[in-house]
């Protein structure tokens, strides 16, 4: 009844609906072009596709808002995105061969990043084999992080960083030089906004630091150019 009082609005909605019908007629049943196959790895997999960092109607929380944009960016990018769980890898150790890039996003010891799954030999072996064979691994926050056997980042040899928890205070940390010319930063203008960012992250010797703030690494790469 309320809409009847605004005929121009009703007419506009009718036109928009017709535009969507035309789009659907043109693209139904057609697979869109995708540049790469991307897997988002967490404890839920498909169970929480596209919503793995949203809590209670996506209410803002300081602890996880920095991760929202990653999933949102993937939704509009030309990638074939799948959400897989650690149990999926345990059930099929060759699962990662279907993908070009694996993304692990979240704070340490959460369902988003994986927690104790990263001490499982099958998981570690599958991810390292994937990277060794040319796959890309992107970690945001505290990926593959769980304190175990003297390491916090269980993929430190792939990620190129470690997080100081008071166990390595006397370890020499000389790698602080930034490489702003790196291809990952070529399309950026001005400062990169990391949201809350991360504290106490330091780079290993062979790592290319892209951005560090007050000797706290925020972005890096092990791809040398």
Say what each PLM segment does.
Residues 1-69, 165, 169-170, 187, ...:
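Hydrophobic targeting/anchoring helices
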Residues 39-40, 83, 103-104, 137-139:
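Structural recognition of the beta-strand scaffold that forms the well-ordered cores
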Residues 45-47, 107-111, 143-147:
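Solvent-exposed loop/turn segments at secondary-structure junctions
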Residues 75-93:
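A short, well-structured beta->alpha microelement
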Residues 95-102:
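Short acidic/histidine-rich motifs immediately flanking catalytic phosphotransfer sites
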Residues 114-191:
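A glycine-rich, often tryptophan-bearing local segment used as a flexible ligand/cofactor-contacting loop or short
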Residues 204-211:
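Short, hydrophobic/aromatic-rich segments at coil-to-beta transitions
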Residues 223-225:
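Conserved small/polar residues in nucleotide/adenosyl-binding loops
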């Amino acid at each position: 009844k309320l809409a009847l009082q605004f005929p121009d609005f009703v007419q506009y909605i009718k036109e928009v609906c017709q535009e969507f019908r035309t789009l659907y007629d043109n693209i139904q049943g057609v697979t869109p072009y995708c540049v790469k196959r991307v897997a988002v790895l967490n404890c839920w997999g498909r169970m929480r596709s596209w919503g793995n960092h949203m809590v209670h109607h996506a209410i803002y929380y300081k602890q996880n808002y920095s991760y929202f944009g990653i999933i949102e960016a993937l939704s509009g990018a030309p990638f074939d995105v799948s959400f897989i769980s650690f149990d999926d890898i345990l059930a099929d150790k060759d699962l990662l061969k279907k993908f070009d890039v694996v993304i692990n996003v979240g704070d340490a010891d959460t369902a988003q990043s994986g927690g104790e799954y990263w001490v499982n030999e099958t998981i570690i072996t599958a991810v390292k084999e994937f990277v060794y064979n040319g796959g890309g691994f992107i970690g945001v926050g505290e990926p593959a992080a769980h304190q175990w056997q003297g390491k916090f980042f269980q993929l430190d040899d792939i990620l190129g960083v470690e997080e100081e928890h008071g166990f390595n205070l006397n370890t020499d940390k000389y790698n602080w030089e930034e490489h702003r010319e790196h291809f990952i930063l070529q399309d950026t203008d001005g400062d990169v906004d990391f949201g809350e960012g991360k504290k106490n992250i330091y780079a290993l010797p062979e790592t290319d630091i892209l951005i560090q703030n007050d000797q706290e690494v925020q972005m890096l790469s092990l791809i040398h150019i």
